[in-house]
């Protein structure tokens, strides 16, 4: 009879309820883009347990006392059924991974050609909805979110960047969805969503140079998660008719001025919730993978690239992380100081969103010019080097040909000179 290890059961039970274990559960299909395919240990263990489970089902119990423990048998059967489900799910995911990998990585040019008109259409259609049908804009935002986010998850997971999905901008998007569909009556949630979207998300476009590159799914999705949520909050507060807003979003009916103290309190509370979850599931539980370089986070990227020479990075652990966390918090408070203006003046809020959109568009234009311009320069330089190398290879051969030709010319002249001398001698003898 197949004997179960209680430690294995406990480990599997704990993993089944962990959010990060769901990500690690998919590890057998790790990225083919940045590394070779690795047949992960999760799949090997699951397949081994499935084989044991198949043998267990074919064998009858050898001991009579096993039949007197239905609880143990039910627990074993449930656990093995879970392993069976995991293996079948992994097989389905692997079967789906091959065409998706071809679409998003190997033959991405076709997808980018199709995504270019899709992005253009959405830019104009979003503007049309905001002006003509504002009551449907939050619905369209939700649809786009659940279209783009699975793509973002898949592409980030394949490139081992899926820990970036736990960043604050995604948390704010989830808060917006919670307000729209579950807690539309929550004044504090709307106040926090408005402050986060018009504060942290909008200024992130300027600070971190989000680029509206309309053929790129990755860059367009980044602009979507930073620009569209403040547009949704703008439409809900400034664009909806009062009667509809009272019925659909009662939490958005606030005075023309924000209570700064309450706003700081609520946003700090939501920020604390996010930081606690982030540091527990990512910083602590996955610290080994982060330190080994298997996974990348925003903190690791900043401290190893843009701010690697910053004095705070060179401090002993955990001071760099503490300084980074506090800096994020004060940055969030600083960026929401102007939210009182965006609440009070509709035109000012519209102009601010327009500036953010134009800033992202300018970054996108800069990307196109710099990226393709630099690639063209590199191609020209490469061709120039090839021509120079070819000329250097041909130079010795040409010199040899020229030297041979000069020798032949000298021989030819000498022969002609001798012939002329003989002819002159014969003529002189005849004359004599």
UniProtKB/Swiss-Prot annotation:
Activity modulation notes: The GPCAT activity is sensitive to N-ethylmaleimide, phenanthroline, and divalent cations including Ca(2+), Mg(2+), Mn(2+) and Zn(2+). The activity is also inhibited by glycerol-3-phosphate (G3P).
* Membrane topology term: Multi-pass membrane protein
Kindly list the places in or outside the cell where this protein is found, as annotated in its UniProt entry. Answer: Membrane
Q: Does the keyword Ion transport apply?
A: no
Q: Which residues lie on this side of the membrane: Cytoplasmic?
A: 1-110, 154-162, 209-221, 285-318, 370-432
Superkingdom in the source lineage: Eukaryota
Main localization category? membrane
Q: Which residues cross the membrane?
A: 111-131, 133-153, 163-183, 188-208, 222-242, 264-284, 319-339, 347-369
Sequence segments annotated as region (Disordered): 413-432
Which controlled-vocabulary keywords does the entry list?
A: Acyltransferase, Lipid biosynthesis, Lipid metabolism, Membrane, Phospholipid biosynthesis, Phospholipid metabolism, Phosphoprotein, Transferase, Transmembrane, Transmembrane helix
Which GO MF terms are attached to this record? glycero-3-phosphocholine acyltransferase activity
Provide GO CC annotations from the record.
cell periphery; endoplasmic reticulum; membrane
The entry's description of pH dependence is: Optimum pH is 6.5-8.5.
Description of the deletion phenotype? Decreases the levels of monounsaturated PC species and increased those of diunsaturated PC species. Does not significantly affect phosphatidylethanolamine, phosphatidylinositol, and phosphatidylserine profiles.
Pfam families for this protein: DUF2838 (PF10998)
Top enzyme category: transferase
Q: What is its EC number?
A: 2.3.1.-
InterPro entries recorded for this chain?
A: GPCAT (IPR021261)
Question: Which positions does the record annotate as the modified residue Phosphoserine?
Answer: 78
Its name, as the record gives it, is Glycerophosphocholine acyltransferase 1
What is the scientific name of the source organism? Saccharomyces cerevisiae (strain ATCC 204508 / S288c) (Baker's yeast)
């Amino acid at each position: 009879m197949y004997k179960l290890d209680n430690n294995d059961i406990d480990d599997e039970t704990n993993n089944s309820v962990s959010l990060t274990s769901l990500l690690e559960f998919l590890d057998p299909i790790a990225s083919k883009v940045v590394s070779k395919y690795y047949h992960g240990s999760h799949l090997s263990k699951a397949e081994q347990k499935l084989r044991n489970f198949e043998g267990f089902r074919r064998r009858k119990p050898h001991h009579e006392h096993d039949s007197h423990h239905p609880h143990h048998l039910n627990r074993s059967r449930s656990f093995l059924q879970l392993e069976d489900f995991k293996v079948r799910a992994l097989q389905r995911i692997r079967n789906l991974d091959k065409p998706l990998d071809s679409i998003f990585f190997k033959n991405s040019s076709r997808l980018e050609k199709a995504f270019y008109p899709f992005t253009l259409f959405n830019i104009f259609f979003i503007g049309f909805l905001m002006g003509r049908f504002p009551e449907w804009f939050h619905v369209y935002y939700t649809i786009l979110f659940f279209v783009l986010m699975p793509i973002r998850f898949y592409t980030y997971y394949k490139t081992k960047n899926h820990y970036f999905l736990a960043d604050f901008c995604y948390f704010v998007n989830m808060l917006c969805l919670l307000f729209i569909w579950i807690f539309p009556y929550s004044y504090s949630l709307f106040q926090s969503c408005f402050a986060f979207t018009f504060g942290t998300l909008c200024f992130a476009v300027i600070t971190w140079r989000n680029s509206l590159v309309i053929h790129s799914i990755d860059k367009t999705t980044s602009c979507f998660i930073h620009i569209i949520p403040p547009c949704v909050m703008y439409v809900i507060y400034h664009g909806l008719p009062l009667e509809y807003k009272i019925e659909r979003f009662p939490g958005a009916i606030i005075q023309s001025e924000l209570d700064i103290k309450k706003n700081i309190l609520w946003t700090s509370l939501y920020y604390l919730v996010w930081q606690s979850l982030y540091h527990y599931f990512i910083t602590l539980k996955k610290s080994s993978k982060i330190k080994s370089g298997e996974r990348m986070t925003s903190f690791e990227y900043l401290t190893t690239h843009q701010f690697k020479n910053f004095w705070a990075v060179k401090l002993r652990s955990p001071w760099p992380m503490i300084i980074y966390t506090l800096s994020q918090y004060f940055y969030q408070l600083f960026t929401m100081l102007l939210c009182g203006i965006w609440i009070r003046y509709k035109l000012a809020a519209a102009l601010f969103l327009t500036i953010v959109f134009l800033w992202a568009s300018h970054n996108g234009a800069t990307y196109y010019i710099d990226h393709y311009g630099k690639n063209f320069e590199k191609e020209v330089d490469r061709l120039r080097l090839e021509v120079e190398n070819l000329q250097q290879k041909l130079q010795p051969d040409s010199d040899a040909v020229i030297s041979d030709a000069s020798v032949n010319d000298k021989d030819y002249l000498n022969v002609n000179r001798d012939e002329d001398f003989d002819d002159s001698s014969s003529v002189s003898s005849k004359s004599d």
